């Protein structure tokens, strides 16, 4: 993963953790946790691709990696919809900027995970 993506994840997670969205703070914490989980999953796929011969190791470690991959894409789609919804309802410019950056990052990560997964198939 390049350093820009790492800093983007860290920046967005830090910004989201500082937001106070009232009664929806539990939802926001859930989004933050999913963002962190997605980052770790993306990193592990990237490492497997870098080792390239690691497909068998990946399959042995997690025999259901295709199912897990599908599940991660569902999580990404859910997060994208949730971020879009938050973007529509917020009037705070700090939150709007944060959610716009989060949306852009999610779209980039989705594309990277697709690229990694095609290389592993």
Swiss-Prot record:
<keyword id="KW-0946">Virion</keyword>
<keyword id="KW-1048">Host nucleus</keyword>
<comment type="function">
    <text>Mediates the nuclear export of encapsidated genomic RNAs (ribonucleoproteins, RNPs). Acts as an adapter between viral RNPs complexes and the nuclear export machinery of the cell. Possesses no intrinsic RNA-binding activity, but includes a C-terminal M1-binding domain. This domain is believed to allow recognition of RNPs bound to the protein M1.</text>
</comment>
<dbReference type="Pfam" id="PF00601">
    <property type="entry name" value="Flu_NS2"/>
</dbReference>
<feature type="short sequence motif" description="Nuclear export signal">
    <location>
        <begin position="12"/>
        <end position="21"/>
    </location>
</feature>
<dbReference type="GO" id="GO:0039675">
    <property type="term" value="P:exit of virus from host cell nucleus through nuclear pore"/>
</dbReference>
<protein>
    <recommendedName>
        <fullName>Nuclear export protein</fullName>
    </recommendedName>
</protein>
<comment type="similarity">
    <text>Belongs to the influenza viruses NEP family.</text>
</comment>
<dbReference type="InterPro" id="IPR000968">
    <property type="entry name" value="Flu_NS2"/>
</dbReference>
<keyword id="KW-0813">Transport</keyword>
<feature type="short sequence motif" description="Nuclear export signal">
    <location>
        <begin position="85"/>
        <end position="94"/>
    </location>
</feature>
<comment type="subunit">
    <text>Interacts with protein M1. May interact with host nucleoporin RAB/HRB and exportin XPO1/CRM1.</text>
</comment>
<keyword id="KW-0945">Host-virus interaction</keyword>
<dbReference type="GO" id="GO:0042025">
    <property type="term" value="C:host cell nucleus"/>
</dbReference>
<dbReference type="GO" id="GO:0044423">
    <property type="term" value="C:virion component"/>
</dbReference>
